[in-house]
């Protein structure tokens, strides 16, 4: 084993250790080292999932914080507590700076290493979907021209991923389904296009249902779980109380072969 291979193996092990300890910032650091290793070629499925899990947890904590603070800000504004509102705005800006830094970090890594080195269709879709996801996270809190740019970048990345997925991945593939799920969330939440969101989610669900019998045992659980999330969103978006926003919109988990919501 070469020194580079040994270092790569050690960083992967340390990333798993950091995950067990729920030290996700360090998990990101270890997996970035793996991704940036010279002549590394494509990451293995395990490695790309570790990278995805690391970043999703780091960004997820800040996204949750931002939503909570934004909700409190709205309540205080409605009560006319201007002194509090100013402090909350300042605090929210701090969280937004952290969000921007995290998104910029993974987007640079995707553009410089991960997307260019991807050769298999599955890898290309995985990384382009990831690129779309992190541009979408920027669009969630940016305003004006920056929001418009983030939304446009999201659309380009998701469409590029979709083109490859439709051509090369089965309708029941967890990564293809996860892409459809997150792309539909983008249409609903960022572009305010509920009809497009529902059409995309319904088509992905219906196409997968038609091929469910041909699904191998290996990905059956992963695929059906994402299909359930697609159906949950469709139910929420088409119900009378969709506008009330009481329920959480579901997104693909940090790794398509995994569990959970955003």
Swiss-Prot record:
Family membership: Belongs to the 14-3-3 family.
Inducing or repressing factors: In response to penetration attempts of powdery mildew fungi.
Organism: Hordeum vulgare (Barley)
Disordered: annotated span: 240-262
Disulfide bonds: none
Protein known as: 14-3-3-like protein A
InterPro entries (UniProt xref): 14-3-3 (IPR000308), 14-3-3_CS (IPR023409), 14-3-3_dom_sf (IPR036815), 14-3-3_domain (IPR023410)
Basic and acidic residues bias (residue ranges): 247-262
Pfam families: 14-3-3 (PF00244)
């Amino acid at each position: 084993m070469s020194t580079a291979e040994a270092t790569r193996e050690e960083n992967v092990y340390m990333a798993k250790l950091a995950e067990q300890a729920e030290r996700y910032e360090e998990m990101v650091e270890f997996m970035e080292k793996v991704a940036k290793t010279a002549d590394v070629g494509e990451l293995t499925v395990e490695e790309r999932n570790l990278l995805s899990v690391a970043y999703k947890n780091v960004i997820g904590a800040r996204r949750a914080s931002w939503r909570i603070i934004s909700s409190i800000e709205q309540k205080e504004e409605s009560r006319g507590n201007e002194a509090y509102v100013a402090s909350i705005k300042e605090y929210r800006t701090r969280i937004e700076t952290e969000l921007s830094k995290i998104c910029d970090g993974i987007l640079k890594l995707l553009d410089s290493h991960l997307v260019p080195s991807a050769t298999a269709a599955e890898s290309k879709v995985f990384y382009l979907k990831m690129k779309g996801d992190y541009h979408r996270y920027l669009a969630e809190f940016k305003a004006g021209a920056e929001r418009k740019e983030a939304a446009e970048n999201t659309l380009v990345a998701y469409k590029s991923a979709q083109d490859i997925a439709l051509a090369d991945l089965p309708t029941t593939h967890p990564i293809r389904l996860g892409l459809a799920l997150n792309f539909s969330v983008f249409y609903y939440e960022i572009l305010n296009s509920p009809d497009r969101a529902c059409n995309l989610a319904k088509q992905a669900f219906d196409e997968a249902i038609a091929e469910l019998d041909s699904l191998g045992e290996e990905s059956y659980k992963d695929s059906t779980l994402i299909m359930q999330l697609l159906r949950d969103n469709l139910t929420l978006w088409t119900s009378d109380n969709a506008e009330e926003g009481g329920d959480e919109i579901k997104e693909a988990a940090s790794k398509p072969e995994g569990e959970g919501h955003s």
